[in-house]
């Protein structure tokens, strides 16, 4: 196997309107809603940076400027904090994102699905490199290390694309992308297929896809040719199905806890989890 290239680029599809959280998301992007003291998007970005990504590609929509503002410098705010000797707050504001990390913003012109959103990043992804894709709605508290870093270790060891997986109750498989593993007793799982939100009786397993992927850059070329599928949208799972025809893709059950911050219940659960963690550490 030739030398595995380091994982440097991460794509964040953040163009969704967040209608489940109206009226709050009428003026605030759902990715900027806070879990304790940080917006949801910040957790995913930190996870990507921890895994070594230094080029972050945000696929945005209208009314998402707050995301760019958050990761940009704010000289006026920094000057005020410095003048008032608020050193701790100044340190936090200056270090939201490391100086070596480059943020790029691409507008998705129309909402044609997750696959299309990912494809919007195609001009920045070379076919010979792998790229991370993180869905911020899936907020993951990794045990000892972030989910993407766990995946990156599998990628670096094998050179194969990696998808994060979680087992769910069979009654819930219709809510997720579901994979067909070659052998459920060999980890990480080698995948034979993937399907989007199948009925229970059609599901190949109860191993479901979590919003973390490390995929061969060729996925972009495949998504370009992908026809609209479920819901009239271009599905990322359809592109992955095509990629499976030409290469090995691994499924990795991650160590940690996932919160579905795309739902009100999951968002509340995440706030309770991280809030209690802060209190246990003596935070305020």
Question: Where is each model-derived feature located?
Answer:
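Solvent-exposed alpha-helices and their adjacent loops that cap or buttress functional pockets
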Residues: 2-5, 24-25, 50, 96-99, ...
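A conserved hydrophobic position in a structured secondary element of the catalytic/binding core
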Residues: 62, 134, 214-215, 262
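Conserved core of the sugar-phosphate nucleotidyltransferase
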Residues: 139-222, 226, 230
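Terminal amphipathic alpha-helical/low-complexity segments used for targeting or macromolecular assembly
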Residues: 1-4, 51-55, 73, 154-158, ...
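Conserved N-terminal catalytic core of the sugar/cofactor nucleotidyltransferase
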Residues: 2-12, 19-20, 34, 38-133, ...
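Short, conserved catalytic or adaptor-binding loops enriched in Gly and charged residues
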Residues: 91-102, 183-188, 242-244
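A generic "binding-loop/recognition-motif" signal
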Residues: 17, 28, 63, 255-257, ...
